[in-house]
Amino acid sequence: MSPGLLLLGSAVLLAFGLCCTFVHRARSRYEHIPGPPRPSFLLGHLPCFWKKDEVGGRVLQDVFLDWAKKYGPVVRVNVFHKTSVIVTSPESVKKFLMSTKYNKDSKMYRALQTVFGERLFGQGLVSECNYERWHKQRRVIDLAFSRSSLVSLMETFNEKAEQLVEILEAKADGQTPVSMQDMLTYTAMDILAKAAFGMETSMLLGAQKPLSQAVKLMLEGITASRNTLAKFLPGKRKQLREVRESIRFLRQVGRDWVQRRREALKRGEEVPADILTQILKAEEGAQDDEGLLDNFVTFFIAGHETSANHLAFTVMELSRQPEIVARLQAEVDEVIGSKRYLDFEDLGRLQYLSQVLKESLRLYPPAWGTFRLLEEETLIDGVRVPGNTPLLFSTYVMGRMDTYFEDPLTFNPDRFGPGAPKPRFTYFPFSLGHRSCIGQQFAQMEVKVVMAKLLQRLEFRLVPGQRFGLQEQATLKPLDPVLCTLRPRGWQPAPPPPPC
């Protein structure tokens, strides 16, 4: 062997040895914390993530659920030299999510701030981890979610939901398969664009296809970017290019919409006190528009994707719950009858629909959880956790544990009935505390209007072969597109022709 090759081999062995020593030392602080065996020394638990069987409808949160059941309320997770801790006790959820002392962990939110080198959510309201900077934004944007502002949005909710139902009624022959995932996504996008930014996207009418495709590619890119090796794999180059182009396209859409609003303001036109108005105010005095575009992308994506998936999961589950559907139809008939416009007051009277939507979020939360940074060593549920550790809190995991919910895999809206005990710090689909979702009331009103109109006018049946599993594309969504055949309410098959 030549001296050069010998030297190179020695250098590689030395580097490998140093890497192993570094990984071992980094993990040694956590070895006392319960957790599953690592299938790989260097990769840690990463191979477990790859084997989660998304083809069968299992997602990463199902792996964490298995570990929480087996190892208790504090579970160690190793990936390379990094360690996170899954926490699943109500006491700890209350302690860490309800206090302003514990911030989001910036390392865990980098996957949203930039994706494959392109700025996506940046320092927007979801991904900003510095409390002071986040609070400055939140205080201004909160004004767009006042009660009076939300009530004024009922017109938009009704308009777009009515448009959806009319399109579906035209396909309601009991035979034509319809992707409810797609239709509900277009509806949520149209609602969000008009309510938040004063723009008409007309997704339901087949317009803006490049925009919907860009959103789809971007969401797939967020998930793909979690594989730290993805950017180095030759087979991923096309996807990386498409994801980057999609992100640039989305931010350009934001620039165009912002420019239109600024021009309207210059002309002295009256503009709504919507989200766009408030994020313009929040970024007054900024040197450039990048922070403003961060919040545009944040609200445009988070504001429609979670609602669309919530609706799709609900339709999927109701397709196998005829007794629950019958109760819902009876309530809708009593509260709104045949009228086409739902009033704000009607929403509060749809009690059982509220229960169904909450139960859907328990089993199928599109936003599965959140992270907090533990800065100092702390005793958590009797286990010493070192400082500078990311803590993971999952409403998906806790919502499916029989420790907190009896028969947790059964869809039972009565868990949220008026006389039922409230789940305390075991159910947080909109997070909790100061970092809870700013748009949760908006989302709850929106999905209630859409579901009420669907139940009022249509019956839906899942096409045979559709699976009830999940997949992850930044958020959790149904594994299949929720293909349904539709019929008008009260539809009866035509009688057979009389004999000749």
Curated annotation (Swiss-Prot):
It is a single-pass membrane protein. Pathway: Steroid metabolism; cholesterol degradation; Lipid metabolism; C21-steroid hormone metabolism. Keywords: Cell projection, Cholesterol metabolism, Endoplasmic reticulum, Heme, Iron, Lipid metabolism, Membrane, Metal-binding, Microsome, Monooxygenase, Oxidoreductase, Steroid metabolism, Sterol metabolism, Synapse, Transmembrane, Transmembrane helix. Its EC number is 1.14.14.25. Gene3D superfamilies: Cytochrome P450. GO terms for molecular function: cholesterol 24-hydroxylase activity; heme binding; iron ion binding; steroid hydroxylase activity; testosterone 16-beta-hydroxylase activity; testosterone 6-beta-hydroxylase activity. The keyword Metal-binding applies. It is an enzyme of class 1 (oxidoreductase). It catalyses: cholesterol + reduced [NADPH--hemoprotein reductase] + O2 = (24S)-hydroxycholesterol + oxidized [NADPH--hemoprotein reductase] + H2O + H(+); cholestanol + reduced [NADPH--hemoprotein reductase] + O2 = (24S)-hydroxycholestanol + oxidized [NADPH--hemoprotein reductase] + H2O + H(+); 7-dehydrocholesterol + reduced [NADPH--hemoprotein reductase] + O2 = cholesta-5,7-dien-3beta,24S-diol + oxidized [NADPH--hemoprotein reductase] + H2O + H(+); 7-dehydrocholesterol + reduced [NADPH--hemoprotein reductase] + O2 = cholesta-5,7-dien-3beta,25-diol + oxidized [NADPH--hemoprotein reductase] + H2O + H(+). Expressed in brain. The mRNA was broadly distributed with higher levels in gray matter zones and lower levels in regions rich in white matter. Not detected in fetal sample but its expression increases linearly with age. Heme binds at residue 437. Pfam families: p450. The chain crosses the membrane at residues 3-23. Belongs to the cytochrome P450 family. This is Cholesterol 24-hydroxylase. It comes from Homo sapiens.
